[in-house]
């Protein structure tokens, strides 16, 4: 099944980019690595959200980007980011995402907007629909704290309004944040935490990432780490989590 998903993911990325001719060398720029939503159900006691927002790294991108992420739980995420309008410092882009469960059935779909700054700061808003749950509306921000030729440090935060379809279950919020570190666009790490007061639940993550391959238009990134959640009734162990992301930039820079 994993091999099938790997082949399917590569076909989706390559077929999308094959329609365009790339005229610019993007070597040295950071590549889109979307945080795909995991879309488990709230009532099953599993994480029901992720930072489903893509924000730019220190260099603002002016080309369309597509990505496929294969997760260790068998799920799969597709992401797209298409520039709409911008100038030398800021770019406004349209976002799109589709997440599939381990049976390749739709787990969520989302659309949104992202505003990226050349210095690595960004804002985004995204609306997601989760079959069997309801809708989620997420606003997120990212600030590039430090950047030079070797090191990059960013802080991020988000708030998600969860709007379940279940009778007698009110809307509720999830808030969270984290810190990302990258060394020479090759090796990095991230720490994250989220809090859902309505469920009296906290989620934690500690991840590492490695850029396996990079060309002017293509990037392959591996991430691995641990996640856990705490509630008054149950506390999970630190569970291993890993994924592989294929990213592709295509089209002419405008």
UniProtKB/Swiss-Prot annotation:
Hemolymph antibacterial protein. Keywords: Antibiotic, Antimicrobial, Cleavage on pair of basic residues, Immunity, Innate immunity, Secreted, Signal. It is found in: Secreted. Residues 1-18 form the signal peptide. InterPro entries: Attacin_C, Attacin_N. Coiled coil: none annotated. This is Attacin-A. Its main location: secreted. Belongs to the attacin/sarcotoxin-2 family. It holds the Pfam family Attacin_C. Disulfide bonds: none annotated. GO terms for biological process: defense response to bacterium; innate immune response. One of its GO terms (cellular component) is extracellular region. Residues 19-62 form a propeptide.
